Amino acid sequence: MSELKDCPLQFHDFKSVDHLKVCPRYTAVLARSEDDGIGIEELDTLQLELETLLSSASRRLRVLEAETQILTDWQDKKGDRRFLKLGRDHELGAPPKHGKPKKQKLEGKAGHGPGPGPGRPKSKNLQPKIQEYEFTDDPIDVPRIPKNDAPNRFWASVEPYCADITSEEVRTLEELLKPPEDEAEHYKIPPLGKHYSQRWAQEDLLEEQKDGARAAAVADKKKGLMGPLTELDTKDVDALLKKSEAQHEQPEDGCPFGALTQRLLQALVEENIISPMEDSPIPDMSGKESGADGASTSPRNQNKPFSVPHTKSLESRIKEELIAQGLLESEDRPAEDSEDEVLAELRKRQAELKALSAHNRTKKHDLLRLAKEEVSRQELRQRVRMADNEVMDAFRKIMAARQKKRTPTKKEKDQAWKTLKERESILKLLDG
């Protein structure tokens, strides 16, 4: 029982952390399923709660380590004391058992006369041994609370926005104000290319020609004639396309009038919807008349195209007249002026880009002006700090002179007044 009373253990009572109160977000996340996951807005709260749990766990761990160290030291000290006790009994009980120490005592008395007793040197020799086994109780290490680094991280993130403006930052602003070399490239409108139908027709024709050339090459290989692939040139493709367009422009009925003339006549002639020509009765012609007209309406004459002179000039004249009246747009206008949805949207975005660039340039000019003003103020604030140091030095000199019970010299007073006036002038410049 005495050993238990002498035990230095404190038996700390560890209080468990209430997760529902201290860590509600952590408890809610644990209660979720794996499919729900964790949101980005919850990470900061989770970090703080996990730091709280880590600090409490480390606190308990340090207290347990301290208790373990105390118990180990106590056991070592207890064993050393038992060893010391046995050593003392052995040293004190050894002289009566052996005869040699008595002879040494007699020789010492006969040779040296009265002197210090024989037991005193032994006591001197035992004292250092006792000092070797002396132990001092180490104080219990109080567990240190882990350092909260959140304020330091916060001020480190805020410092760049509150620090003094440097000359490099001003130089960066000046470089940003320089117009970029490729600024004009953003406002160029690319020329209008070929229509997609023409481009696709050209690509399809090229593809067909390549396939035909490959098929011909395969046939030549079968016959034993090895020849290179013949690819159609782009100019040949354009010539073929123009030829096909010219062929398609000619109507099947062989009408010599142009497309514009036909459209104009179709717009002017009223169509008889009630009685179409297919249902209209065909009048009977007499045999003579039919015989006379038979030569003109023979099948051989129907295949020949109907020829009318000056159809091209008529087509161009009608076109000019319609353009003059404003009923038809001129095709001589450059392609850049042709308005379409893509061009309108492109010009709209270019106008927005110009307005935004002008706004940004204005703000950069204002920012550069404010930065230069702030740099000059920083220099004044630096001069104020230097003036404050000079004023404090003059004040210390005057106070040292008063402590020594001597009046300050005229030089010291003049220096103090001079530094004060300089400081006031700098403050006026800073406030102005």
Curated annotation (Swiss-Prot):
Main location class: nucleus
Annotated spans, Disordered: 87-126, 272-319
Keywords noted in UniProt: Acetylation, Coiled coil, Isopeptide bond, Nucleus, Phosphoprotein, Transcription, Transcription regulation, Ubl conjugation
Tissue expression from the record: Ubiquitously expressed.
Annotated InterPro entries: Histone_AcTrfase_su3
Top-level taxon of the source organism: Eukaryota
Cross-link (Glycyl lysine isopeptide (Lys-Gly) (interchain with G-Cter in SUMO2)): 21, 129
Pfam family, one: Ada3
Modified residues (N6-acetyllysine): 418
Biased amino acid composition, Polar residues: 295-305
GO biological process terms held by the UniProt record: chromatin organization; estrogen receptor signaling pathway; mitotic cell cycle; negative regulation of transcription by RNA polymerase II; positive regulation of DNA-templated transcription; positive regulation of gene expression; regulation of cell cycle; regulation of cell division
Disulfide bonds: none
Annotated localization: Nucleus
GO molecular function, one term: protein domain specific binding
Ubl conjugation among keywords: yes
Coiled-coil boundaries: 40-69, 367-407
GO CC, any one term: ATAC complex
UniProt keyword Protease, yes or no: no
In-chain residues carrying the UniProt-annotated modification Phosphoserine: 280, 298
Protein's job: Functions as a component of the PCAF complex. The PCAF complex is capable of efficiently acetylating histones in a nucleosomal context. The PCAF complex could be considered as the human version of the yeast SAGA complex. Also known as a coactivator for p53/TP53-dependent transcriptional activation. Component of the ATAC complex, a complex with histone acetyltransferase activity on histones H3 and H4.
Subunit structure: The PCAF complex is composed of a number of TBP-associated factors (TAFS), such as TAF5, TAF5L, TAF6, TAF6L, TAF9, TAF10 and TAF12, PCAF, and also PCAF-associated factors (PAFs), such as TADA2L/ADA2, TADA3L/ADA3 and SPT3. Interacts directly with TADA2L and PCAF and also with the high-risk HPV oncoprotein E6. Component of the STAGA transcription coactivator-HAT complex, at least composed of SUPT3H, GCN5L2, TAF5L, TAF6L, SUPT7L, TADA3L, TAD1L, TAF10, TAF12, TRRAP and TAF9. Component of the TFTC-HAT complex.
Family (UniProt): Belongs to the NGG1 family.
Protein name as annotated: Transcriptional adapter 3
